[in-house]
């Protein structure tokens, strides 16, 4: 039987040989690979940078959040780098002293001092109030310093003794002192300037005790709110809303609306470029506009602001109700005399007041004259009756009482409403916060249309805010209509204006105008650190970190690209060497076939 055997010995190159590819095609593949890899890296770089850019505002917001949390902690009086300042608010009903502190300035002339309210060991704000107002010293001005002694002693106990001599003291008097004759004002201030330095060694001079105007008080309130909201921090805010002054290139500030019991105030930033106005309006605008620089260097203009501020006496919620009652009383009595009626003269024949809840009875006394009211809860009719109290003029650029109002860009503005703006929306209606005109109007109208017994029962059941009382329930219908008319008819806010926030606290704390006052009064203090070379002019630490972060990202991707290119070049080099070896072994393979194949045939036998 014949036996056939085969040899499986083959050249080693046969086991690794791939189908032949033309050199031109291999070059194209290599070129596409070299082109594709950088494109992918570039795409990843762009995506990462976009993520980094969007994360910066979040990081900065987180930093601000941590700073706000730190503001609520007890002040470390052992820190030698802290500075202190005192502001006394001498109001009409009493006086309060506020203690503020701030760390050493960071040396950047573009930054403001980081002023915060001092907190004691229990993390409570360091503030003290006494009554009555300092205007009670009008007949005995020599006792004015005795009147303020408890406040200053309180502050001296909280400020470290070694810091007293460098702690500025500002005594700022408001409404109560404004009503006094100038002679009495000067006598009270003179006693303070003369006697207080004898007992307290705070940094205090004659210019630091004054009676401020309503305009100054409004500007200080505007400064304080915007400072707490971080609107004066212009660093890394490219994604924020644009300023009302497009040429400034900075964050948009907020306007404030504040309706108290007796007065109403509005303040907001206006563009520095004044529009063409008639001579009378231009003169009025100059009186109502305040332009100031919060920066320490007058050559730097990023903190120059132009603010419109006006106070309307008699337009507060309680005073407006009195004006309304006087108007109704006079008109009703005159109508009774002309028509021989007795409307409102007895509880059985009351005046039907659309501004009171349904069925609520009330009574008004004026000069031995009595008028009886009964609510009928018609919110729309109430608004109509309130319209004459706005005292508007036919001029398009006039607001309440015919006073000039600088134009507001309602498409690029933001406002915060305090006091009555918050109470009207929150205490009873429970819709405080973001204000929406139609929603508020519907809620106010529904409330006014409810029967008084139903509202009283809801109050007993605790369905309203804990701050609501019987007075709020009785006059909520009136005050909501008054607030609505003032906002939309008086100040010309659109009914669907989306950027009004009603609030009582800002970041869980009450913001006083005194904060704005000390910010403005101490604006030049950073120059001391700059001149002494304490820190010098340098970018903020956060900016350095962000620049370093960008540099590291670029360096990482550059190194990655170099490594990948080196790998590609190495693979190409290996491929070329392998191809040369394959070509060199081809003749040997042919020779091997010629020699071995015949031997295979010989092994085949019978």
Curated annotation (Swiss-Prot):
Catalytic activity line of the entry: a ribonucleoside 5'-triphosphate + H2O = a ribonucleoside 5'-diphosphate + phosphate + H(+); UTP + H2O = UDP + phosphate + H(+); GTP + H2O = GDP + phosphate + H(+); CTP + H2O = CDP + phosphate + H(+)
Keyword field contains Mitochondrion: no
Necessary cofactors: Ca(2+); Mg(2+)
Entry's localization field: Cytoplasmic vesicle membrane
One Gene Ontology biological process: GTP metabolic process
Tissue and organ expression note: Widely expressed. Expressed at high level in brain, kidney, liver, testis and small intestin. Weakly expressed in lung, thymus and heart.
Residue positions of the active site: 217 (proton acceptor)
Claim: Transmembrane helix is one of the keywords in the record: yes
Consequence of gene disruption: Deficient mice are born at the normal Mendelian ratios and grow healthily until 16 week of age. Normal lymphocyte development is observed. However deficient mice shown an increased in ATP concentrations in the small intestinal lumen and increased numbers of IL-17-producing Th17 cells in the small intestinal lamina propria. They show increased resistance to Citrobacter rodentium infection and increased susceptibility to experimental autoimmune encephalomyelitis.
CDD domains per UniProt: ASKHA_NBD_NTPDase4-like
Cytoplasmic side: 1-28, 570-606
GO cellular component terms listed in the entry, alphabetical order: cytoplasmic vesicle membrane; nucleus
Broad class of where this protein is predominantly found: membrane
Membrane topology value: Multi-pass membrane protein
Any Pfam family matching the protein: GDA1_CD39
InterPro entries hit by this protein: GDA1_CD39_NTPase
Disulfide pairings: 448-477
A GO molecular-function descriptor: ATP hydrolysis activity
Glycosylation: residue positions: 330
Spans through the membrane: 29-49, 549-569
Topology, Vesicular side: 50-548
Entry keyword set: Calcium, Cytoplasmic vesicle, Disulfide bond, Glycoprotein, Hydrolase, Magnesium, Membrane, Metal-binding, Transmembrane, Transmembrane helix
Function: Catalyzes the hydrolysis of nucleoside triphosphates and diphosphates in a calcium- or magnesium-dependent manner. Preferentially hydrolyzes nucleoside 5'-triphosphates, with substrate preference for UTP > GTP > CTP. Hydrolyzes nucleoside diphosphates only to a minor extent. In contrast to its human ortholog is able to hydrolyze ATP. In the epithelial cells of small intestine controls luminal ATP levels, therefore regulating Th17-cell development.
Entry similarity comment: Belongs to the GDA1/CD39 NTPase family.
Protein name, UniProt field: Ectonucleoside triphosphate diphosphohydrolase 7
